[in-house]
């Protein structure tokens, strides 16, 4: 039995114990984790500094460096997120529905943990805590495989989690991390279907492709966010600029940040110079289509010609594609062609246009007069999220607690036999 099989077997055994825990016991473990994250913050931050130094030396982009960075404020926020998970309702054991059948069998459908979840992610140290806390709350064990960029941070964080579990009399194997950077171990994890019940990749398109093609475990894909906002012909310009500013500027490296702005041709001449001035204030580079370039070339913001491939990639930086479309249908066609089914928005004062857009755009989250940045487990009231799914089975959008459960049928009889 190799390393991964040992980890898988230990995780499966831990999952049986977790599935039997009361909500109070799970919350106790989460509270201890949150407290230890704070008391051991210097150890975790020092580990993160080692990862940051190595990442800078390797030439990592600013966007990825921002994802990798932990600050005292970010770590404190992560600890508070764990406490928020404590306050969330536990879905495990909840009766979804039930009925008394003509046969006399009392039948109910009850939420239960999935079992063991595998998560593969890249330069996102917060994922370690987010995933672990949600899995523990739902009675699932988890095997984590972070990128080599987060090696020291993940090691320190998982050590804190396992110490907390042991303090609460729970198996440390409930949260395990693959520490070796050997990529062959990823391939082995993808085939560990004897022990792992669901796999969630959080990373770039190549990672998602690898998991879809090689995994023998059910895979939940998503998190790649080529997010769009369409400025309709009757949008309120000043309010639209505030939404665009938030969607692009607040955290450009996030998967729910705005990447492509589509503007109705009827308002392009007036709106685009205003956009240029607003984006200039934040150092945004505009990547303009041939139609948009005449209205942006003399503006304040830096502008370059958009490349065809730009429409299909996440910038994750202070860059924004800008194009002009003839009408709402052209905007929808563009989103269907280049979107990733993550988060897309319309800015409009027309109720009929808003409803048409919502029905036509097949994304996991669609917004009317709101920023795409809202696609987040915390913002949706789900607590920390394990991922944002852009597929339709078994979960869609930010994956909170319910998405980490399945259900079982339970039948109650009085020595009942089938006739």
Swiss-Prot record:
PROSITE patterns registered for this protein in UniProt: PROA
GO molecular function (one): NADP binding
Gene Ontology process terms (BP): L-proline biosynthetic process
This enzyme's EC code(s): 1.2.1.41
Pathway: Amino-acid biosynthesis; L-proline biosynthesis; L-glutamate 5-semialdehyde from L-glutamate: step 2/2
Gene Ontology CC entries for this record: cytoplasm
Xref: InterPro entries: Ald_DH/histidinol_DH, Ald_DH_C, Ald_DH_N, Aldehyde_DH_dom, G-glutamylP_reductase_CS, Glu-5-SA_DH, GPR_dom
Keywords of the record: Amino-acid biosynthesis, Cytoplasm, NADP, Oxidoreductase, Proline biosynthesis
Reported function: Catalyzes the NADPH-dependent reduction of L-glutamate 5-phosphate into L-glutamate 5-semialdehyde and phosphate. The product spontaneously undergoes cyclization to form 1-pyrroline-5-carboxylate.
Family in the record: Belongs to the gamma-glutamyl phosphate reductase family.
Name of this protein: Gamma-glutamyl phosphate reductase
